[in-house]
């Protein structure tokens, strides 16, 4: 029925909106926690900049187009589910960043964190491109702009929540 299709569209949009909020929270929270991370791991400002910006952004920007192409040729929903799992897993691994000792060789906590932030960027690259395509598939031209605007509001909601949660975590717990 038309009512069922409308509910399905709106439910899908709500799920995409919530996923986008979490996507943005993850990007913003690290900015609030960076001084705690810097102190805990003994990072310098260059390392901090690489971890918060470069490591994430290079992979995110580089992988966005290939991931979008995969989403267009396979299952958009499937790409989003896999991407969500990747970025969630790597986000959790960020909190476990410690030096790794392999015999006499040591991988520094900075390198571990850099690699995990790159993994987060890889996962998050599969968020918005398939979401935009799914919204375009679900909503007819006359309603598509509003649907995309609602989805995009997740950016601002995620930023607000990311800064709030980051501040709270920094005071109440620790960055890990």
Predicted regions and their residues:
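Extracytoplasmic
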Residues: 11-45
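Extracellular/periplasmic helix-loop-helix junction of adjacent transmembrane segments
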Residues: 33-62, 107-111
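Conserved MFS/SLC helix-loop-helix module at the cytosolic interface between two early adjacent transmembrane helices
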Residues: 62-105
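Cytoplasmic helix-loop-helix junction between adjacent transmembrane helices
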Residues: 112, 116-156
